[in-house]
Amino acid sequence: MTVERLENGVIVQRNTNEIEISITLDTVHGKLEGSTGVNFFDHLLNTFCHYSGLGLRVSTCESKDGILHHLIEDFGISLGLAFRELFDYTKVRRFGEATVPMNEALVGCYVDLSGRPFFQKNFEFSVEKIEDMPVEGFEEFMCGFVNHARITVHFFKFFGKNDHHISESAMKSFGLAIARALEGSEKKTTKGVID
């Protein structure tokens, strides 16, 4: 994996026996450019970008073994590393939270840019796929992102039956929580460092 810093962004390239990914994460555009080849995953990524205010350009996203699990997980790894490289967690608010309704679904997201990776959600999906994306991809993406961004993320589903609505409500709340955590603040940590 290689990382290249830009003025307002980071390029991450990841090439394994399973996938080849090249992405740029920036603080300027606030939208997704390009495609992962998985339409619903693209929809979730664009949702995250819109609500977080971050820009994501996908230059390359190819599966060498045809297994979506690997592609989605490795995309999360790449994006998480880009996020970690782009932001200094000691210079932002650090904590963020948001709760977002979408029709019958209501999901909250709670974020800590702590330097300590942890992911938890209190819901499971009731179907195997949402559109063209295996539902296990949601958790694989989030775990890849969280572990390499080194942040804590909790999702709490208050209500919801439709898996499309639940996943989109979750991603909207994640984007908003990240945006709030990235705001400037004088209060970061009582121990003086984030590691």
Curated annotation (Swiss-Prot):
Main location: cytoplasm
Broad class of enzyme this protein falls into: lyase
Disulfide bonds: none
Location(s) in or outside the cell: Cytoplasm
Superkingdom per UniProt: Bacteria
Record keywords, A-Z: Amino-acid biosynthesis, Cytoplasm, Histidine biosynthesis, Lyase
GO CC annotation: cytoplasm
GO molecular function: imidazoleglycerol-phosphate dehydratase activity
InterPro entries cross-referenced by the UniProt entry: IGPD_sf (IPR038494), ImidazoleglycerolP_deHydtase (IPR000807), ImidazoleglycerP_deHydtase_CS (IPR020565), Ribosomal_Su5_D2-typ_SF (IPR020568)
Pathway assignment: Amino-acid biosynthesis; L-histidine biosynthesis; L-histidine from 5-phospho-alpha-D-ribose 1-diphosphate: step 6/9
A GO BP entry: L-histidine biosynthetic process
Record bears the keyword GTP-binding: no
This enzyme's EC code(s): 4.2.1.19
PROSITE patterns in UniProt: IGP_DEHYDRATASE_2
Family, as annotated: Belongs to the imidazoleglycerol-phosphate dehydratase family.
HAMAP family: HisB (MF_00076)
Database matches in PANTHER family: IMIDAZOLEGLYCEROL-PHOSPHATE DEHYDRATASE, IMIDAZOLEGLYCEROL-PHOSPHATE DEHYDRATASE HIS7
Name of the protein this chain belongs to: Imidazoleglycerol-phosphate dehydratase
Species of provenance: Thermotoga petrophila (strain ATCC BAA-488 / DSM 13995 / JCM 10881 / RKU-1)
Lineage, opening ranks: Bacteria, Thermotogati, Thermotogota, Thermotogae, Thermotogales
